[in-house]
Design a protein with these regions (language model features):
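Functional transmembrane alpha-helices
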Residues: 1-118
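Cytoplasmic/organellar membrane-interface segments at the starts of transmembrane helices
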Residues: 29-51, 105-199
C-alpha cells in the first residue's frame, strides 16, 4: 500500500503543479477577470491552452493511460482483501467523479462562454514565459506514463526499505566511535560549562 501511495503522491504533485500553471496561463489571458470562473473575453491561445488543460484534467481525474489512472489502479489493487477496501474504492471513485464534473464545468465556462470583445493589452505581461515549465511538466507526465513500471518498482523498493524497522534502527542507533566529547553516551550528568571571560 505504501508503494502505491508513493506513486500516487508523485503523480498528484506533478499533475496539480501542471494544473496550477495552466490556470495561471489562462488567467493571464482573461483580462481583469483573471482566474474567476465566469464568461470573459476570448483567450489569445485557446487551442494550446485548451489542450494543456485537457491533459492536466485527464491526468488529475485518472483517465487511462495517464499516470493518474495508474496511481489509482495501484491503490485499488493494494486495498484488495484489506479492512476499509470499500471506503478506499468509494473515495477514489467519488473524487474522480467530482473532479470530472468541476473541471468540465470550468472548462466549458472558460473556453466556450466568451465575450466577443478581445483583449489587446495583457496586464500580466507575456504569459508565454510560463510555457517553459508547463512544457517541462508535460514531458514529466509523458515520462511517468511510458515508464510507470520502473517508477513503481522504485516506489516499491522505497516502501520496503521504509518498512524494514530493523535496518532503520541499526542505521539510526548505530554507535559512531569518535573521540569528540559531544558524541559520548549521555550518563545523566550535565556537563559543567564556564562562562567566557570578558576581556
Amino acid at each position: 500500500g505504501i508503494a502505491a501511495a508513493l506513486f500516487y503522491l508523485v503523480h498528484s504533485t506533478v499533475t496539480v503543479t501542471l494544473l496550477f500553471l495552466v490556470v495561471a496561463l489562462v488567467a493571464a489571458q482573461r483580462g481583469e477577470i483573471g482566474d474567476v470562473i465566469q464568461p470573459a473575453p476570448a483567450l489569445r491561445d485557446p487551442v494550446a491552452l485548451g489542450l494543456l488543460m485537457l491533459l492536466a484534467a485527464a491526468s488529475a481525474i485518472g483517465i487511462p493511460p495517464l499516470p493518474g489512472f495508474l496511481g489509482k489502479l495501484y491503490l485499488l489493487e493494494a486495498s484488495l482483501d484489506r479492512p476499509g477496501q470499500g471506503a478506499v474504492w468509494l473515495t477514489l471513485i467519488a473524487v474522480g467523479a467530482l473532479t470530472l464534473i468541476a473541471l468540465a464545468r470550468a472548462g466549458v465556462t472558460i473556453f466556450w462562454h466568451t465575450h466577443p470583445k478581445r483583449i489587446t493589452v495583457w496586464p500580466a505581461g507575456d504569459s508565454r514565459v510560463l510555457m517553459q515549465p508547463v512544457v517541462a511538466l508535460v514531458v514529466v507526465v509523458a515520462a511517468m506514463t511510458l515508464w510507470a513500471e520502473p517508477l513503481y518498482r522504485f516506489t516499491y523498493a522505497a516502501a520496503v526499505q521504509a518498512a524494514d524497522q530493523t535496518a532503520y534502527a541499526r542505521v539510526v542507533l548505530e554507535r559512531v566511535h569518535f573521540s569528540a566529547p559531544w558524541t559520548r553516551p549521555y550518563d545523566g550528568v550535565l556537563p559543567q560549562t564556564e562562562p567566557p571571560e570578558v576581556p
